[in-house]
């Protein structure tokens, strides 16, 4: 019984059985209750605790402490549990046995890189779509936060037993693409000394000037020799492909890769758009009025109907969304879809659910995560513009300044619905004040200890972990034990910020152990046991960093 999740289930089952025994003895009435346990803030209250007696006191007519004593009396400490106790004002506490904790070190060493994996998903197919920035310009730090959220959740869901595909949706069919093409051609003409005006609805950033210069360097005046419409379209297609390459490069520098880059255009050329519209029409969710085509989402509880085809015959962005989600659920048969969008998409969530219902798809299969934006600071001062371009600071500039690992950790460090400040100066500090440095330094320190042991010719493969018993040793093991539970929590809540908190707590537990316990000493048997603990902590910390998409440095 080496998994903390197994121990957790045993505790919950023992509480359920205790309730039933108390009912059979006439001490409490029949009750229907969800049993939950959690880690107390202080380990002297045990490793798990439940407030069940406090919640049931009124229903049973008993004082919480009295009820706690009754239930605890029916619980026998099982495998892995050394003690069951009660504490005011009505908690039941469970304490792990030292034997279980010491054996866990061997379990971690045996499972190695698979430690922390659980079979929550059972191979269920999940698609996560994130970033999906328009291919009309560089990506910014807001896109970066969405990218890190998506890739980290993918890592965690895979560790939790799901089959996961990561997808970037290319918005290559809307009016913004036409504006991009017209802008690029105007800049191309200007680069060749021709007079041309950038369209008012175009893209006015310096990057378009640079992109046009690239086109001139590669193609000369080739596109001035063609009919305007053909030249503008063909050059625009090349420019858009180049923009996608730059976006992909920026994301790769953040350690974000996609399994699929999905073109919006393919929904129309591949027939999914027509098929999805036919389904809505057959189900009476399409209405024609004001020379436009509407999706009757109010029939499904939405606050208003939504235009899907404008009066000029062009589909709206929502029309593409309908076809895209038809493709995800019906054609590609994903069991669950997770969309990670910026908070400015809040208004789209309810109509997406309505649209799925209209297509005959259970809307609960779609989860939309909305994340807040990031405020960049430098030593407390707001950073608004790039020093290099004088425009909005790009993701690539931030990565270049502080590194991908710092970006990933800070982007993950707050819950998705929380706005966050990202202090560039803090992210570069080489001190415990910087959580990225603090966590990665713990891993480097571990590697240094193991390297020293190797230099001294110390083998610890036969080390006896039963010799471990110091408070700092057991606290470190307790924290290491939590990784499968953290994976389960993040996979269930889709809130990866729990990983950053856990990483800091784990690093802190290791640093405290290092301070309190001399690893390599004249006592070779104890040294071997502690080296086993150090190696196991390396595995758990590296796994945690891997789940966050970060590196595990061997030296710093």
Curated annotation (Swiss-Prot):
InterPro entries: aa-tRNA-synth_I_CS (IPR001412), Arg-tRNA-ligase (IPR001278), Arg-tRNA-synth_N (IPR005148), Arg-tRNA-synth_N_sf (IPR036695), ArgRS_core (IPR035684), DALR_anticod-bd (IPR008909), Rossmann-like_a/b/a_fold (IPR014729), tRNAsynth_Ia_anticodon-bd (IPR009080). A motif ('HIGH' region) lies at residues 133-143. The keyword Coiled coil does not apply. GO terms for biological process: arginyl-tRNA aminoacylation. The keyword Aminoacyl-tRNA synthetase applies. Keywords: Aminoacyl-tRNA synthetase, ATP-binding, Cytoplasm, Ligase, Nucleotide-binding, Protein biosynthesis. GO terms for cellular component: cytoplasm. Pfam families: Arg_tRNA_synt_N, DALR_1, tRNA-synt_1d. GO terms for molecular function: arginine-tRNA ligase activity; ATP binding. It catalyses: tRNA(Arg) + L-arginine + ATP = L-arginyl-tRNA(Arg) + AMP + diphosphate. It is found in: Cytoplasm. Transmembrane segments: none annotated. Its EC number is 6.1.1.19. HAMAP family: Arg_tRNA_synth. Monomer. Belongs to the class-I aminoacyl-tRNA synthetase family. This is Arginine--tRNA ligase.
């Amino acid at each position: 019984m080496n998994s903390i999740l197994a121990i957790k289930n045993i505790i919950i089952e023992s509480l359920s059985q205790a309730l039933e025994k108390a009912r059979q003895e006439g001490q409490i009435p029949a009750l229907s209750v969800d049993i939950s346990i959690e880690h107390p803030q202080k380990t002297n209250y045990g490793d798990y605790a439940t407030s069940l007696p406090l919640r049931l006191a009124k229903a049973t007519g008993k004082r919480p402490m009295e009820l706690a004593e009754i239930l605890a009396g029916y619980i026998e400490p099982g495998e892995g549990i050394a003690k069951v106790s009660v504490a005011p004002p009505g908690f039941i506490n469970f304490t792990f046995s030292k034997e279980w904790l010491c054996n866990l070190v061997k379990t971690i060493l045996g499972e190695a890189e698979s430690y922390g994996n659980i079979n929550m998903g059972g191979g269920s197919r999940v698609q996560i779509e994130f970033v999906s920035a328009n291919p009309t310009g560089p990506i910014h730090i807001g896109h970066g936060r969405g990218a890190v959220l998506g890739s980290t959740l993918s890592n965690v869901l895979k560790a939790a037993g799901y089959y996961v595909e990561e997808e970037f949706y290319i918005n290559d069919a809307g009016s913004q693409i036409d504006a991009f093409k017209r802008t690029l051609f105007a800049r191309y003409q200007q680069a060749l000394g021709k007079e041309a005006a950038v369209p008012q609805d175009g893209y006015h950033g310096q990057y378009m000037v640079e992109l046009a210069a690239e086109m001139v360097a590669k193609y000369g005046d080739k596109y001035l020799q063609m009919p305007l419409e053909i030249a503008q379209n063909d050059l625009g297609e090349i420019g858009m492909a180049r923009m996608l390459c730059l976006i992909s490069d920026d994301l790769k520098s953040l350690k974000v890769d996609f399994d699929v880059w999905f073109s919006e255009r393919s929904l129309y050329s591949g027939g999914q758009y027509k098929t999805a519209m036919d389904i809505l029409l057959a189900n009476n969710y399409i209405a024609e009025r004001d020379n436009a085509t509407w999706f009757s989402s109010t029939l499904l509880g939405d606050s208003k109907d939504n235009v899907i085809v404008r009066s000029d015959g062009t589909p709206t962005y929502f029309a593409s969304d309908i076809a895209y989600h038809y493709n995800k659920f019906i054609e590609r048969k994903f069991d669950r879809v997770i969309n990670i969008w910026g908070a400015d998409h809040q208004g789209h969530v309810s109509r997406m659910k309505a649209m799925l219902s209209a297509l005959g798809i259970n809307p609960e299969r779609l989860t939309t995560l909305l994340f807040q934006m990031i405020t960049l600071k430098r030593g407390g001062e707001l950073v608004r513009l790039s020093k290099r371009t004088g425009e909005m600071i790009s993701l690539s500039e931030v990565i270049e300044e502080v590194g991908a690992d710092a970006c990933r950790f800070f982007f993950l460090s707050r819950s998705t619905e929380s706005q966050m400040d990202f202090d560039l100066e803090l992210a570069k500090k080489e001190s415990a004040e910087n959580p990225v440095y603090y966590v990665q330094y713990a891993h480097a320190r571990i590697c240094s200890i193991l390297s020293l042991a190797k230099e001294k010719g110390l083998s610890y493969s036969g080390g006896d972990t039963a010799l471990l018993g110091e408070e700092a040793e057991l606290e470190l093991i307790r924290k290491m034990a939590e990784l499968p539970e953290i994976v389960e929590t993040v996979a269930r809540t889709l809130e990866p910020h729990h990983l950053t908190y856990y990483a800091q707590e784990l690093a802190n537990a290791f640093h405290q152990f290092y301070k309190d316990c001399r690893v390599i000493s004249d006592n070779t048997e104890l040294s071997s046991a502690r080296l086993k603990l150090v190696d196991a902590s390396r595995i758990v910390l590296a796994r945690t960093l891997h789940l966050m998409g970060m590196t595990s440095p061997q030296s710093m």
